Amino acid sequence: MILPVFAFGQPVLNKKADSITKEYPELHEIIENMWETMYEASGIGLAAPQIGKAIRLFIVDTKQMKDKKKEEKKEGIKKVFINPVILEEFGNLWSYEEGCLSIPDIRGEVERKSCVKISYLDENFEPREDIFDGMEARVIQHEYDHIEGRLFIEYLSPARKIILRGKLENIKKGKVSCDYKMRFAIK
């Protein structure tokens, strides 16, 4: 089932999410709904807070990225991350223009480390520890920020934040056009 994406201004997007257990109600259904929702919105990552669930869960699929950097000759990843913990961010800082399904029509340059070491549980609650680099690392860091209650716009320069203030207020009020269902803070 395709769910509405919670828009900027929804309190759940600014809350640090809670860890979950294997017994979390309807977890596999939530994960399936997240995949459907993300693909419908043409996203490459989606965190549970973006569908209104304050739980430590996100999904990433970089296999279907349209504009992968040519020098990255990787297949990409398609993974579920449950109760993830970033153990280390390392490598060079690199800037890239990010966007977010919760903040439609806004993009901004964000600097992030090029590599990330992360521990997590997969969809079968099997423990994993992996190192990712490049776009995979970036998307993971972006989605991880969501479960920590942070949005990419918090990394933008003060001047850019001022410029975006009006657009962000419009998003809160639902005065934005996008091709997927959204739930807004102010009706």
Where are these regions (language model features)?
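Positively charged
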Residues: 1-187
